[in-house]
């Protein structure tokens, strides 16, 4: 019974310390994923603008 209490205590301490140290690299990965999303959004908006301009040119060329 005493071993179980010690095991739970050690596991709890490890979980707390690992949880605090893991936040650094998880935050970096999250920022990288967020940046990829922003670049994708910006490229999509730019692509839509170019497509709209091409459609306008095509409509003008047809008369």
Swiss-Prot record:
Expression by tissue: Hemolymph (at protein level). Strongly expressed in larval, pupal and adult fat body and hemocytes after injection of bacteria. Maximal expression in the adult involves fat body cells of the head, thorax and abdomen.
Protein's job: Cecropins have lytic and antibacterial activity against several Gram-positive and Gram-negative bacteria. Functions in the imd/NF-kappa-B (Imd) epithelial and humoral immune response to Gram-negative bacteria.
Gene: CecA1
Organism for this UniProt entry: Drosophila melanogaster
Family listed: Belongs to the cecropin family.
Signal sequence interval, chain numbering: 1-23
Consequence of substituting residue 14 to V: In strain: MJ3
Protein name, per record: Cecropin-A1
Biological process, per Gene Ontology: antibacterial humoral response; defense response to Gram-negative bacterium; defense response to Gram-positive bacterium; defense response to insect; defense response to virus; humoral immune response; innate immune response; response to bacterium
Transmembrane regions listed in the UniProt entry: none
Induction or repression: By bacterial infection (at protein level). Induced as part of the humoral response to a bacterial invasion. Transcripts appear within one hour after injection of bacteria into the hemocoel, reach a maximum after 2-6 hours and have almost disappeared after 24 hours. Similar response is seen when flies ingest bacteria present in their food. 8 hours after bacterial infection of embryos (2-6 hours after hatching), up-regulated in the larval epidermis and 16 hour post-infection is up-regulated in the larval fat body.
Residue numbers bearing the Arginine amide modification: 62
């Amino acid at each position: 019974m005493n071993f179980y209490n010690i095991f739970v205590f050690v596991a709890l301490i490890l979980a707390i310390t690992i949880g605090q140290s893991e936040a650094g690299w998880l935050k970096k990965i999250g920022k990288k994923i967020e940046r990829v999303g922003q670049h994708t959004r910006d490229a999509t908006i730019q692509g839509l603008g170019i497509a709209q301009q091409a459609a306008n040119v095509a409509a003008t060329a047809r008369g």
